[in-house]
């Protein structure tokens, strides 16, 4: 259903959003929780309406329409205030899928309307995503995801995006896998886009987004882009495709589906599909023109999200998927052309009936030309015919992949079963049949290539003959007699018809070969099969060349790394030696510092000793003067001894005189006093001799300390000179 008026669209989409939230209101969050494609499309539609209204005078009105929509009889704005509760205990209040969807969408809408500065948006989203991490950690709902709309992304700087990415990458317990993948894509896309001239740009309203790599559908849904938006690509991107819609689920399950896609031949499209509200609407970009080593989203498992959220796989778990040949190619939608009216001619087979799905037959009305009216329509003769293969179980080129995979599985099974396994015979028979099938497939492919070359040759010949016929007719129109030229024209026409018949026979043979390979009677288009085969072979060849280049680069990088490792080992040895030398120097420096400190103390002590030495020298000088005096006094000692002997003589005489009674008492008294003076002087001289010996020993000690200090000062000076050099 197509809607045009913005207010009408906003009213309808607000009602759809409220209905979807109400339906999911009581679904408790768990590890199995996830949003269906219908729910994701409903979210995208309402966010697109709000984004479009930002450049009009209707933005407040669209927001009011959304706020006044009711859920269980209560307006959305009141419900949002209740579950948000000013950010208090949010993880306990948002415990169901419906509340989760309402909380995220209303937060994004409020941010779009009220914030325009990147710092304000970043601050809000930082708090918001921390709440999201708390919710995911509490309930383990890793598959729940509602990404940031493009209207907010384009206002953020790459530093803000990296910081928001770190919110999820550092919260290992949050289990927010898709949010992490979303910001990882934005980070990779930014740095690849800044260094490349290749790009695909998608835009609507005032928002646009460019990428040089494939863009998965969940990224496009988060950014709110649809296949009806304006698409522009650089001219060097030749193999780019836009997926637009899910056609049906494979094998009656939701594990895998068939999708419609449009090959982007032109550089600009005003949308490749109609603007509808279909639940099965899809939008993803597949870019096969860029190196697969930098495009991690090329794999079909990552590009197109399955309906069952728990079947979603991460990048590290996926295997190569080549099921793109199962999808349907459709022409780009042109709103200026009327919608095509097709009649399938057959009914859609029931889910339980029939072993094979039949292709859609396109019935064309007969031409007014009688020759064309009497024979059935052959699409191979129509130059405007666009072949469409639908519900193909497997493409011709994929048979080789299937055979290789089966042989690999059989080899693995044979290794596990061993030589004495009970299935050895069956395994050998299966491998033999696969080998025969592989040989037959190679033979058929060689025949197909031969027929292709013959077809090109015949086509060129037909063009050449057609040109000659035109020249002959031009000559005939300029002459009166054209009988000879008429015969030539008839002959040429016969040759052309024979060439066309042979071409039809070869095409018929090619169809038979293809039907044999496909093991069934199929009325599909040979040309389409050949086109798919050539495209697949070219893609495989490109992938192989890319892998060879990648391997060569890896080997070169490995050799460079080995050289770097050797150099690093050498540097490591030098570093260890340097560390040892540095540690030795550090220990020496520590020792020197301690010695310097000790020498500084000794220097202080030396100054004290010097002062003491000066004092002692002064005392020594005094003592020397006294010693000289004592020496002079010692000279008097002999006189004293002589005096003593004289005294003894006098005493003897005195004694003799007293005994004899003839002495003079006065003379005796005088002599006794002189003797006393001499004895006093003698005692003083003895005391001076003792003091002199003590001072001499003290002088010897001080001289010894002075010599030690001088030697220490000389050693310190030499050490300081060595450290300085």
Swiss-Prot record:
Organism of this sequence: Vaccinia virus (strain Western Reserve)
Presence of the UniProt keyword Ubl conjugation in the record: no
PANTHER family: STRUCTURAL MAINTENANCE OF CHROMOSOMES PROTEIN 2
Organism domain of life: Viruses
Localization (cell): Virion
One of the GO BP terms on file: viral process
Cellular component GO terms, alphabetical: virion component
Region: 4 X approximate tandem repeats, residue numbers: 609-718
Coiled coil: 418-521, 547-719
The protein's name: A-type inclusion protein A25
Family statement: Belongs to the poxviridae A25 protein family.
Self-association state and partner proteins as the record states: Interacts (via N-terminus) with protein A26.
Keywords linked to the UniProt accession: Coiled coil, Repeat, Virion
Pfam family for this entry, one: Pox_A_type_inc
Miscellaneous comment in the UniProt entry for this protein: Some orthopoxviruses such as cowpox, ectromelia, and raccoonpox viruses, form large cytoplasmic inclusions within which mature virions are embedded by a process called occlusion. In those viruses, A26 bridges mature virion with inclusion bodies through interactions with proteins A25 and A27 on the mature virion membrane. In vaccinia virus, the protein A25 is deleted in its C-terminal region and no inclusion body is observed.
Sequence repeats: 609-635, 636-663, 664-687, 699-725
General function of this protein: Structural protein that forms a matrix surrounding the mature virion (MV) through interaction with protein A26. Presence of protein A25 in the virion structurally prevents direct virus-cell fusion mechanism.
The keyword ATP-binding is annotated on this UniProt entry: no
Main location: virion
């Amino acid at each position: 259903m197509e809607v045009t008026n913005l207010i009408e669209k906003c009213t309808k989409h607000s009602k759809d959003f409220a209905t979807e939230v109400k339906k999911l209101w009581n679904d408790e969050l768990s590890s199995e929780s996830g949003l269906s494609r219908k729910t994701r499309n409903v979210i995208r539609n309402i966010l697109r309406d709000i984004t479009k209204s930002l450049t009009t005078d209707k933005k407040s009105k669209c927001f009011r329409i959304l706020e006044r929509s009711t859920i269980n009889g209560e307006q959305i704005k009141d419900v949002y205030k209740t579950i948000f509760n000013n950010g208090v205990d949010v993880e306990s209040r948002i415990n169901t899928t419906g509340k989760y969807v309402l909380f995220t969408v209303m937060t994004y809408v409020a941010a779009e309307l009220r914030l325009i500065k990147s710092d304000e948006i970043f601050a809000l989203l930082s708090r918001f995503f921390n709440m999201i991490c708390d919710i995911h950690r509490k309930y383990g709902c890793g598959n729940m995801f509602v990404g940031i709309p493009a209207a907010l992304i384009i206002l953020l700087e790459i530093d803000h995006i990296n910081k928001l990415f770190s919110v999820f990458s550092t919260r290992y317990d949050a289990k927010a896998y898709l949010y992490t993948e979303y910001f990882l894509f934005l980070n990779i896309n930014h740095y690849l886009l800044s260094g490349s001239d290749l790009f695909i740009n998608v835009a609507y309203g005032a928002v646009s987004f460019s990428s040089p790599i494939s863009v998965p559908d969940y990224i496009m849904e988060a950014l709110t882009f649809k296949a009806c938006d304006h698409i522009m690509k650089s001219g060097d991107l030749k193999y780019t495709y836009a997926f637009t819609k899910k056609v049906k689920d494979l094998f009656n399950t939701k594990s895998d589906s068939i999708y419609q896609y449009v090959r982007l031949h032109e550089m600009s499209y005003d949308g490749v599909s109609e603007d509808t509200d279909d639940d099965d609407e899809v939008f993803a970009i597949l870019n096969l023109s860029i190196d697969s080593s930098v495009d991690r989203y090329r794999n079909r498992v990552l590009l197109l999200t399955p309906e069952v959220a728990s079947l979603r796989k991460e990048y590290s778990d996926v295997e190569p998927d080549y099921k793109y040949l199962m999808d349907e190619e459709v022409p780009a939608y042109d709103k200026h052309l009327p919608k095509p009216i097709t009649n399938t001619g057959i009914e859609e087979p029931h889910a339980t009936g029939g072993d094979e799905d039949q292709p859609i037959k396109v019935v064309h009305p007969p031409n007014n030309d009688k020759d064309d009216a009497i024979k059935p329509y052959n699409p191979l003769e129509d130059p405007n015919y666009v072949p469409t293969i639908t519900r193909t179980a497997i493409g011709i080129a994929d048979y080789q992949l299937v055979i290789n995979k089966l042989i690999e599985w059989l080899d693995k099974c044979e290794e596990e079963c061993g030589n004495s396994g009970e299935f050895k015979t069956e395994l050998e028979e299966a491998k033999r049949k696969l080998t025969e099938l592989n040989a037959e497939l190679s033979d058929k492919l060689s025949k197909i290539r031969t027929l292709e070359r013959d077809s090109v040759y015949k086509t060129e010949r037909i063009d050449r003959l057609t040109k000659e016929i035109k020249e002959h007719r031009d000559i005939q129109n300029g002459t009166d007699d054209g009988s000879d030229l008429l015969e030539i024209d008839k002959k040429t026409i016969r040759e052309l018809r024979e060439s066309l018949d042979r071409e039809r026979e070869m095409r018929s043979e090619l169809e038979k070969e293809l039907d044999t390979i496909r093991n069934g009677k199929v009325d599909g288009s040979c040309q389409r099969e050949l086109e798919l085969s050539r495209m697949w072979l070219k893609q495989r060849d490109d992938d192989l060349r890319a892998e060879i280049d990648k391997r060569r680069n890896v080997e070169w990088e490995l050799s460079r790394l080995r050289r770097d490792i050797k150099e690093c080992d050498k540097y490591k040895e030098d570093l260890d030696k340097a560390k040892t030398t540095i540690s030795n120097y550090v220990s020496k420096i520590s020792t020197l510092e301690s010695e310097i400190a000790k020498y500084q103390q000794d220097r202080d002590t030396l100054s004290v000793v010097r002062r003491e030495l000066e004092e002692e020298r002064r005392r020594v000088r005094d003592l020397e003067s006294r010693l000289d005096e004592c020496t002079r006094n010692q000279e008097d000692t002999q006189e004293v001894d002589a005096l003593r002997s004289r005294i003894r003589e006098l005493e003897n005489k005195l004694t003799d005189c007293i005994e004899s009674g003839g002495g003079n008492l006065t003379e005796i008294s005088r002599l006794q006093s002189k003797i006393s003076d001499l004895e006093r002087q003698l005692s003083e001289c003895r005391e001076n001799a003792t003091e002199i010996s003590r001072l001499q020993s003290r002088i010897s000690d001080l001289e010894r300390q002075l010599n030690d200090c001088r030697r220490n000062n000389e050693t310190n000076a030499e050490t300081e000179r060595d450290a300085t050099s």
